[in-house]
Amino acid sequence: MKLVLASGNQGKLNELKALLSKQPVEIYSMSDFNNIKEAQETGKTFAENAIIKAQNVADSTGYLSLADDSGLEVDALDGAPGVYSARYAGENACDQDNNNKLLRSLKDIPYKQRTARFKCVIAIAYPDTPPVTFTGTCEGYILREPKGDRGFGYDPLFYHPDMGKTFGELYQEEKSSISHRGKALEKLVANFQDVMSLMEG
């Protein structure tokens, strides 16, 4: 069976191929197809956006498709930046712009109330079949200043208590073992045969 990743990101493609290497599936990137239009991420939740992206590719190609959507939820900000994580400081904002806005928004919030989580939702879609989702979360706190220069996005501000470091201080292997995306992918791998049966049925 063919599975199309609803992304042109080579890193995500390699990761997915490695995780599903023992499964009877050929994995492609949406870059391998010419007829796929960019999906409009109009969802109010990570799950809605992941489903929109996966369904768009499934309907365009006729194949099983996988997409993910993820971001940061800060409790003191009622779950913001949420689905706007990548553009929190504006449409063309860079990581530093978003981080600076987050720090300004939490300026007067004490550490104990700076709880936050990274959330990732993976959606699998197939034409004329209800989509299936898997969710992974990683809990932590937002620091008052960035630490570490690894990772991307909010990683230097996101402190993981069990690791005693920010995501910006962790090596990729360490981060993958505890990250929201890693947890969602684990659930996908554990349930992949069931999902295949459901979609093929």
Curated annotation (Swiss-Prot):
What function does this protein fulfil?
A: Pyrophosphatase that catalyzes the hydrolysis of nucleoside triphosphates to their monophosphate derivatives, with a high preference for the non-canonical purine nucleotides XTP (xanthosine triphosphate), dITP (deoxyinosine triphosphate) and ITP. Seems to function as a house-cleaning enzyme that removes non-canonical purine nucleotides from the nucleotide pool, thus preventing their incorporation into DNA/RNA and avoiding chromosomal lesions.
Task: List, alphabetically, the NCBIfam families matched.
Answer: PRK14822.1, RdgB/HAM1 family non-canonical purine NTP pyrophosphatase
Q: What family does the Swiss-Prot or TrEMBL record give for this protein?
A: Belongs to the HAM1 NTPase family.
Instruction: Provide the binding site for Mg(2+).
Output: D69
What the entry lists under PANTHER family is as follows: INOSINE TRIPHOSPHATE PYROPHOSPHATASE, INOSINE TRIPHOSPHATE PYROPHOSPHATASE/HAM1 PROTEIN
Names of required cofactors: Mg(2+)
> Binding residues for substrate, per the UniProt record?
S7, G8, N9, Q10, G11, K12, S70, F152, G153, Y154, D155, K175, H180, R181
Q: What is its EC number?
A: 3.6.1.66
Span-the-membrane segments of this chain are none
InterPro entries linked: dITP/XTP_pyrophosphatase, ITPase-like_fam, RdgB/HAM1
Give the annotated active site.
D69 (proton acceptor)
Query: Catalyzes what?
Result: XTP + H2O = XMP + diphosphate + H(+); dITP + H2O = dIMP + diphosphate + H(+); ITP + H2O = IMP + diphosphate + H(+)
- Record GO cellular component, one term: cytosol
**GO molecular-function term, one example from the UniProt record:** dITP diphosphatase activity
Q: Which CDD domains match?
A: HAM1
Could you tell me the keywords of this UniProt record?
Hydrolase, Magnesium, Metal-binding, Nucleotide metabolism, Nucleotide-binding
Q: Which organism is it from?
A: Natranaerobius thermophilus (strain ATCC BAA-1301 / DSM 18059 / JW/NM-WN-LF)
Could you give the cofactor binding note from the entry? Binds 1 Mg(2+) ion per subunit.
Q: Which GO terms describe its biological process?
A: nucleotide metabolic process; purine nucleoside triphosphate catabolic process
| Keyword Zinc belongs to the record | no
The identity of this protein, by name, is dITP/XTP pyrophosphatase
Q: How does it assemble?
A: Homodimer.
Q: Which domain of life is it from?
A: Bacteria
